[in-house]
């Protein structure tokens, strides 16, 4: 899910 666009490597994959 794209919750945090600031950290797409971690939050982007979740």
Curated annotation (Swiss-Prot):
It comes from the Eukaryota. The keyword Transmembrane helix does not apply. Midgut. One of its GO terms (biological process) is neuropeptide signaling pathway. The modification Arginine amide is found at residue 14. It is found in: Secreted. Keywords: Amidation, Neuropeptide, Secreted. The keyword Transcription regulation does not apply. One of its GO terms (cellular component) is extracellular region. Coiled coil: none annotated. Its main location: secreted. Myoactive peptide. Increases the amplitude and frequency of spontaneous contractions and tonus of hindgut muscle. This is Tachykinin-1. It comes from Schistocerca gregaria (Desert locust).
């Amino acid at each position: 899910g794209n919750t945090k666009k600031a950290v797409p490597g971690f939050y982007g994959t979740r």
